[in-house]
């Protein structure tokens, strides 16, 4: 990311784009956005996994895609707008965690092998033959399906390696594009516009007793500030999973809040 950002500063002409194939686990896409927006640049970041099939196309009953997230960072005069959404109704990670703990999803975001909606994450097990619905669910899933195809084109197709290769190992295909507003209408007018519509959205009337409109990334930025000051809150199953690795590698575990 740093290499792409720094190289872009030295290139004139069209916006810069980078394609990566067989990447390691990329993690949360939003984590990569802030350094770019802090430099006053616009960023688009997407990824797919050619070896992963957990999401069904709209109208189908068998998985064909990975969740195919799309992330974008938009600079403003204040905090940036940080967008990070899957083109599926939910993520593999959430389904895995809930299946492990025997919990259900908040909604019927999956389908079983017969195409019936369900909130049971266990249908994603290979022998069950279920799938995650695309963003929009049973009724409007054509929207998520279309976005998933767009991500497939940006990542696997542009990278020259994808599902047609029947990759047996997991590995992300990544597409990154960075745009300098100065090369278009100018940075000043860009920030004027992005800052205006950010504030315009915050000032939108809401029903009585409801919180104000929250921009994408706003809650995450606030959580980051709090956890930098008070410590990082981990999902309950993470620390137990780290214990055997820490023991094997001789690495001391961090002190948890309950042990302080």
Model-derived features with residue positions:
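Catalytic-core signal marking the mid-to-C-terminal active-site face
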Residues: 153, 164-260
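Glycine-rich phosphate/pyrophosphate-binding loops
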Residues: 42-54, 153-170
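Conserved active-site and cofactor/substrate-binding residues in soluble primary-metabolism enzymes
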Residues: 27, 31, 67, 130, ...
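Phosphate/diphosphate-binding glycine-rich loops and adjacent basic-rich segments that engage nucleotide
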Residues: 54-126
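Short glycine-rich or small-residue beta-strand-to-loop segments that form or flank ligand, phosphate
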Residues: 16-21, 134-136, 176-182
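Secondary-shell segments that build the walls of catalytic and ion/ligand-binding clefts
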Residues: 103-163
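A glycine-rich, acidic short-motif signal
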Residues: 1-81, 87
């Amino acid at each position: 990311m740093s290499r792409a950002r720094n190289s872009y500063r030295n290139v004139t002409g069209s916006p810069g784009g980078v394609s990566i194939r067989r990447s390691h686990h990329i993690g949360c896409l939003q984590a990569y956005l802030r350094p770019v927006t802090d430099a006053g640049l616009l960023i688009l970041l997407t990824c797919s996994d050619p070896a992963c099939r957990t999401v069904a196309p709209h109208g189908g009953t068998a998985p064909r895609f990975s969740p195919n997230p799309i992330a974008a960072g938009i600079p403003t005069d204040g905090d940036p707008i940080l967008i990070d959404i899957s083109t599926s109704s939910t993520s593999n990670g959430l389904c895995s965690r809930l299946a492990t703990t025997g919990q259900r999803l908040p909604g019927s975001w999956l389908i079983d092998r017969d195409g019936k909606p369900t909130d049971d994450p266990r249908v994603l097990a290979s022998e069950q033959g279920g799938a995650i619905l695309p963003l929009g669910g049973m009724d409007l899933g054509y929207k998520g399906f279309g976005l998933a195809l767009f991500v497939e084109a940006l990542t696997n197709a542009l990278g020259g390696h994808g599902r047609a290769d029947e990759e047996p190992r997991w590995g992300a295909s990544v597409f990154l594009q960075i745009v300098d507003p100065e090369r278009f209408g100018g940075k000043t007018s860009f920030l004027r516009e992005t800052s205006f519509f950010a504030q315009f959205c915050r000032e939108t009337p809401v029903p009585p007793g409801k919180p104000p409109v929250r921009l994408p990334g706003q809650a995450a930025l606030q959580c980051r500030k709090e956890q930098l000051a008070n410590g990082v809150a981990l999902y309950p199953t993470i620390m137990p999973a780290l214990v055997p690795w820490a023991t094997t590698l001789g690495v001391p575990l961090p002190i948890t809040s309950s042990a302080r």
